[in-house]
Amino acid sequence: MARRMSMYSMASEAMGGPQAPQQMSTTTLLNAIHNIYLSSQPYQIDAGTSLVVNTWLTAAQAGATVDATLAARAWEHARRRAEDGCVVLGSLHQATPSLLVPFLNTFPFAIPASIYKSLEAVQPFLRCVTPYNASAPRQIALGVTLTLSLGGSVTGASLALSQGGIDTENGLLNVPAEAGYRAFDVFYYLLTSASTPAEREFLGLKAPSAYALLARSGTYEPPSYLITADDGAAADDFRQALKEIGIKGSVHRNFISTLAGLLKLGNTLDYDADSDDFEEICEDVSGLLGMEPEVLMQQLSTEDRRTLVAGLYEALVDWVISKANAAIAAQMLRIRDGDESVDGRGVRTPNENEDGDTVSITVVEVPEPALGRALAMRTIFDDTLGINAEMIEDGVEIHPASSSVVREMQQAVADVAPDLGIMTGPQGRDRQHDIEKREVILEKAAYASEEDSFLKKLLFPVEGQGINLGRTGRFDLPGLLSSSRAWFHLALHPTDDSPANLATLPAITSAWSAGTISRQLRSWRLPEWANRRNRSLDYTADFDVDEFVGRYGALGCKDGKDGIETWMLERGWSNGEVFIGKERIWVREGPWWEAESMLDIKPAHSLQSIGQNPFTSGFDTSYSANPPNGSGFFPAPAMDNSMNGSNDQLMHTRNFSQGNMSQATFNQHPHLNPQSAPSIAPSAMRNAQPATGDYGLGNKGDTYKGQVFYNDDGDFTGKLDGDLAKDKKIETKPLTFGRRAWVAFVWALTFWIPSPLLKFVGRMRRPDVRMAWREKLVLFFIILLLNGLIIFWIIGFGKLLCPNANKAWNVKEVAGHAEDEDAFWVAIFGKVYDITDFWRQQHSDTSIKTTKTNMLPLAGMVMDNYFMPPLNRACRGLGIKETVQLTFNETITNPLAQHVSGFYTRDRTSALHNADWFWTTFQPKIKEYYHGDLVWKEGTVKSQGSGSEQHPWVMYGNQIYDLTDYLHTLDVNDNFDTYKFLNEDMVNLWKNSPGTNIKKDLDLLISNAKNETVAANLKNSWQCIQNIAYKGIVDFRDSPRCRVNNWLLLAFAIIICIVTAVKFLAALQFGSKRRPSPQDKFVICQVPVYTEGEDSLRKALDSLTALQYDNKRKLICVICDGVVVGEGNDRPTPKIVLDILGVDPKVDPPALPFKSVGNSAEQLNYGKVYSGLYEFEGNVVPYIVVVKVGKESEQTKSKPGNRGKRDSQILLMSFLNRVHHRAPMSPLELEMFHQVNNIIGVDPELYEYLLMIDADTCVEEDALNRLVAACAHDAKIAGICGETALENDEKTWWTMIQVYEYFISHHLAKAFESLFGSVTCLPGCFTMYRLRSVDKGKPLIISDGVIKDYSVCDVDTLHKKNLLSLGEDRYLTTLMTKYFPEMSYKFIPDAQCKTAAPESWSVLLSQRRRWINSTIHNLVELMQLKELCGFCCFSMRFVVFIDLTGTIILPSTTVYIGYLIYVLATGTGPIPYISLAMIGAVYGHQALIFILKRQWQHIGWMIIYILAFPIYSFILPLYSFWNQDNFSWGNTRIVIGEKGDKQVVAVDDEGFDPRSIPLQRWDDYAMANNLPGRRGGYQEKTDYSYGDNYELDEIKSVYSAGPQGSVLTGMPGRNTYMPPSPAFNNGRTSTMGFQESPMQHRQSMMSMGTGVHDMRSQSPYQDYPGQHPGVANLRGQANLSPAAGGGHSRSGTALGFSSGSRSPMPDAMRSQSSFDFQHGQGGPTDMAIVESIRSVLCEVDLDTVTKKQVRALVEQRLQTELVGERRTFMDRQIDHELENM
């Protein structure tokens, strides 16, 4: 049982405030009330009743007065006694403000944030403005039920109205017709401008005066005395609250429609309503409510409609409450799963098993004084009911109340009998009649509504139960009181004056009327109440005899009543304090709490006898302020009022705090928490051995024996054997619809591959591995299919659409081969021939020789006239003589090439003399060289026919014929009949329709021949024309079918070219390199370390130390991912790191637990924390090192503590998240906080940026300042990266091919994405994130959502593996873009770093596999985001799509480039000018970039890159795609099947118990260990600013010898406190102060790995280098008594000195041991700076000089560069001097 001292226990006797005397009178009580009113305190008239006095003014300005002690008392009783409690918030005056929320805030546990949001959503339905109360509740009673575990933490919560419902009569139907009254607030919120214009138009809303329900009083605005009250602002908050409880979208539309319908229906409640208006209103309302208008107009009377309005309104409120309860339940589920903290801020580690027994506390607000009076008086004065009757029956002597009191009680109960469930009297019968009538009317409305309408769901919330209004979701108020222990919190009002008058009073407590208070006291009979309770009834606990003995037996109580009585006498309790009844033991509050306190301080091992008592279960460690017995991992407090609080005991318990915390941590002592979750890592590994100089890490891996090796990626080379479900715990997890659909799709494609084949042949024994292989196969197939489709689309699809496109050539294309001896093309009678292989042959049989001179002029010509056959052979059947030949219209330019055959052949010996030479010799030979058709554009044909020369060209279908030479011959020969051999009618078609398609006319002419002779003539003429006039075909390539593919390709080509051009322009940043001014933001430099070597680590740490940035404002945070020996190393990596940093090897900090990213039991991990100062080249920088060492059970494994880089990032992110939210922390995080806050001396909350680098990265000196300056200039930047170059660029061929890729990927891709503020991959090797937004301090990289998604433990699918195991850095960027799309993610090339590239093929292959696969899976995630900036095709969504497809189709790109090379080399197709231009543009732009940037070396790198293009674009992608499932699959959680919507998982370990990692808030931990640096409240700050009263010199670093303050020097004279931040108990004052003690320093100070001694002795900056004080010396100095004046400030150091001393050490000692971390070796004084500024301003021209120039001149004059506060002072002083000139 985890025992601890409750906050309540500290002041249990004091009751937390003034108490009632034994005998009370009205005057006495009146005086007491006046006193508590002036002091804003509660007054307890008995142990269970408190009185408070509040007005709206005190509540608004000073905070409502509430009794936190009563809340704590109710909580303690509930959890310790396992009994339900009920706190009644009664109001004795109609003007008292509501105390529901303030009272909830006083509970000593965190209230779920969703409860407050739910109340925000519900209260506008219940509150009204009245002349006496600006927010008067109109409900009968509203209850907030908090379900608690027996440990006292919240496990559930809900809201409910009592069965009495809401006073709709005064709040809606019949608002008093007096000024100052309003209806329910929700209606005014509906009508404000918060409603969108679309909503207002849809609802038809008007001004409030247009609605009868709102117009009765004529008051439409909030009271004027509330200067901040505004319905518009409140409506915005209300709408947001509705959204947060799930009322949004269509549900919200239905909700506001119903609300508007009720408002409009109110206009029909007047009996004299106009009939036309009445019908119009009913039509409108029926549309809004979704019911038939006839029901409203005809079936319901006016009185019925009044009942309908009231009933629907209550049903709507019940529905809103049900939605609120669902939202609360959802948050509680997330809290139980550890996804969220109770207050909704920060991630949470569950620390309690919340599945056990529970109790509940119900806080009931009863705003009506009459009902509250009746409830209270019946509880106190009625001896026939409840606990009073039980006590009387058990023998407790109770003095009866006076008859007058009894009569008043009976009359009070009778007045409100129906609300108390008493239905026997006249009022009850009337109420019952009204309820029955309401049910009939509501049932009629429900059945008249549309099926599945919102109205029907409102009225029938439970299917099959009919109208249940007033019962479903409501609570029985009398029943609740009778079944719970009742506590009363009663609120009085000091005056009857109107609230407006209170605002004019001189003080908030000036309002007082003794008569008013007296009337309230007498009305409720409070004096008699106090006297009766204190005399007879004030027993707050009761037990049966066995239960009492069982609980307190460990304290010496013996069995039986006699044993109890004896024990009572030993304790000094009288019979009045503890009464032994017939059956039960009755105990008053004082004795009961005294006994409980003794149980708390009793050692746990002596309480085993009550170990099974349900009332003694473990408590939630996240609450405790002072765990007295070292509960869990937390040590005992130094302040202990128990018998164990001696000095010896004090020293003993303090030694648990840090250096010796392991004793408490690992249950070394038998009295520590036997019921808490057992530690999985016993202490043996930590503390069994003395310090041996190994940093407490052991000697594992120190000797290089070759047992454990890791490759360059840190992958263990050993083998793992997986077991399946045998002897394992089987779990089922629900699957998302997307996952189920994907699994079904995978199986549909791979069903033909039997699983046994994969299992036995493929050696995939596990189902999850086989499933991943199937997924990989499907993805690989899809990618190959996509690549194939791309290639087919570019190369083959066009040919499929346009089959002969590559065999068609126009005259221009043919002419393009003129004078081309290697591509000799000619066109003859509409055909194109490639006679390249023929023209050189000696093919002439005459004296004419075939020479180049003769032949080349003919290349590219159309040679129809050179090969005209004899007409008598070409036009048979037309009676043409052999002497007839055509006269050509065009002159033959090369007569030697004319082939005239037949009669006119010049050489009779030639083969041309044969009249059939054209058909027998020429055509068979020329066909061998056929290359395609000669094509003409249709426009060319038409222009030839319609031009000035009007050539007779016509189309016959797609064929083209030209009769120009025939008609020209007739013209030359005067139409001599010998030459008129063609049919006249046919020739007329050419003459009359030139340029047109005559197919239809010609076919008609032939078919309509008069006789056979004419038909024969026509056919012969047509045959003749086909032989001598054929010109080619219409260019079909211009058809849509052939053009569409080219246009699509061209469109994409244009888009890609535009994107390329924009990328090029984005990369052009001319001008000199900017030199931003020095920045002063606090930055954490995170370095995750795994298996890197000493050289790489030293370079990385040295580069961070040497950064040109204020050393005090940067913190190096090294996180070692396990105790791992890297390849080539002779010791584990953590030891290498600690050696480099100079940590004393004898330092052995404890291993502390924290939650890791891992499967099941791997979530429990342990880590050690070291801190100190690291010096390099004169720079001294603080560092903190966290070494993950793992559990005890891991020490025999190869990599204890290793959980991956993602876990290292999450460790720091989660820590900063909890720092931001001030949430409970794990022990490791508490130690980190202590080291940073108290040892280093900087509040972790001051850090604003997180710089992430890899351990093999060297950062340029100005890089960090440039990154911070960019973020300071643009507050929207959430993440930013710089340029990463290679430091080993010339090491091997494999590094050389990467140089150009690194350069161009930054200056093109990232520069382009940065234009949109959406860099899709911020590399983990060099990226900086902003921790919080500037305006509101909203967490960014440390937000709950990012951490939750990034810390997913169950990485059991292929997609998750590629996201979270390969591409952590890219996925982190994806998550940031997902959760903060409105923020920017930038790249700046001026910030540079260098990293080492893979030097071997195997490592490069492994790296690119991770990069490519993670890129694909991350970009798929990015494509699902809804909000990415940009517009049209320049949206980042489009660019992401281009990047995604570009990565996937890399192989097809390589294939296509190969195809282009083939086409160009062989000339087998048209030259692809566009493709060549695109390739030229891409590489041309890239070349221009580095030429313009004068990066000449990249010319050579570019050539090497192009040579390696097939490797990057073909080999690496295909290898990566196929190896998507190449992971190490752990054996802890094995997915053995996915069936339906479930995933079956076999778990093979002890599991993870969240209780093994207890949580505690820093303030509680600091108080328990007397540590400085307590922070105050826990609520999230509303603005990320610290106010004027906050100085950074509140915490003093142990490394500093400067004046009191932090490392920032600050103002020594100031001594302000931490920024006030309201906590959940904001209204309460502390019961004790805190003062630093001389004993505050503990031995653990120097054992925490701080490295103080080592670093100080090495520092070149100490004044006396020869003197090296040892640790003992420092400790001795630490124990010096503080100087006089030690006060209550938090500002002391971790060494334990009082803040009253300006220095922790005497002046003589300062320089001996401390480097002045604030000032270095000094600097210019304020006066020197002022004098320099004045001198400079006197010398410069004030009209032209800039402030930056003045600053530079001042620094030049001072011969130093001012940073931090000194720079701020200089800037402020420059402004001051300029103002005074």
Swiss-Prot record:
E.C. code: 2.4.1.16
The protein's name in its UniProt record: Chitin synthase 7
Chemical reaction(s) catalysed: [(1->4)-N-acetyl-beta-D-glucosaminyl](n) + UDP-N-acetyl-alpha-D-glucosamine = [(1->4)-N-acetyl-beta-D-glucosaminyl](n+1) + UDP + H(+)
Membrane topology: Multi-pass membrane protein
Pfam family, one: DEK_C
Entry superkingdom: Eukaryota
Disordered as annotated region, ranges: 1677-1712
GO biological-process terms attached to the record: chitin biosynthetic process; fungal-type cell wall organization
InterPro entries: Chitin_synth, Cyt_B5-like_heme/steroid_sf, DEK_C, Kinesin_motor_dom_sf, Myosin_head_motor_dom-like, Nucleotide-diphossugar_trans, P-loop_NTPase
Annotated GO CC locations: cell septum; myosin complex; plasma membrane
Biased composition (Polar residues): 1690-1702
Induction of its expression: Exhibits higher expression levels in hyphae than in germinating conidia. Expression is increased in the absence of chitin synthase CHS2.
Gene this protein is translated from: CHS7
